[in-house]
Amino acid sequence: FASQRLFFALCTYLMFRGKRISYLELLALLLATIYMYQQTSTTSPFYLSILILTYVLFSIKIFKKEFIIENFWLKKIANYGFILALIITLYFCFYSSGNLFHLVDQFTHNRLRLSVEGFRNFGVSWLGQHIIFTTMDIFGNFTSNYNFIDSSFVQLLVIDGLIVSTFMLFALTKVMKYFVSIRKDIVLACLGIMIIHGMFDPQMLVLRYSPLILFISRLFIMNSDNNIE
């Protein structure tokens, strides 16, 4: 999981440095991303890391423009990014056409299919449930009945239940609205990349990877003088 750790570390570093980031730092982050991809061949964190580094380069260094904050529609999308991501994930799972479903499933290495199977096998309860996923056999090989749910959003619903999911979406939406209100463009871009990552990867709300839980814990004491960006 080194590639996932690097991805979240990169996003966290970009959020902390913000407009103070230098070309040398961006180059170092790019080289670290390329090296990690060569070692692990993990595509999702690699492509998303390249995307956010490109955004930061164009936003801060080349055009010196806050693309999200200065665009009315992107600002609205940012406010409700987590809710929109959940809606899109559920649409892909239950309402997308056969061709679109198979395209997304293939692009995400069967993770969409596993999300659908997770809903069918375990369902969604109000208070959540304890689930033991079947992943590998005693020899370390993937089993034929592998059923791990990779999507952070689907995990939230299936494992934590509707009540916790509602609270988490409410809290995360408050976080997004806060950063929109204080015009933290790079922070919003990084959070947006994390949201996209979380649609098909399970680390978004895991503390040892992602800072999102820390943002929620500081939700009611955040102020415009903090050190983020």
Predicted feature locations:
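Membrane-interface micro-motifs in multi-pass membrane enzymes
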Residues: 1-10, 149-152, 157-161, 203-209
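Alpha-helical transmembrane segments of multi-pass inner-membrane proteins
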Residues: 1-40, 44-58
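Membrane-interface helix-loop-helix junctions at transmembrane boundaries of multi-pass membrane enzymes
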Residues: 16-26, 66-75, 173-190
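A juxtamembrane structural motif centered on a specific transmembrane helix
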Residues: 17-21, 216-229
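Aromatic-anchored segments of alpha-helical transmembrane domains
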Residues: 31-38, 85-91, 191-202
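A membrane-periplasm/extracellular boundary helix in multi-pass inner-membrane enzymes
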Residues: 38-39, 55-104
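Long extracytoplasmic/lumenal interhelical loops at the membrane interface
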Residues: 98-160
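Hydrophobic transmembrane alpha-helices and their immediate junctions
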Residues: 159-195, 219, 224
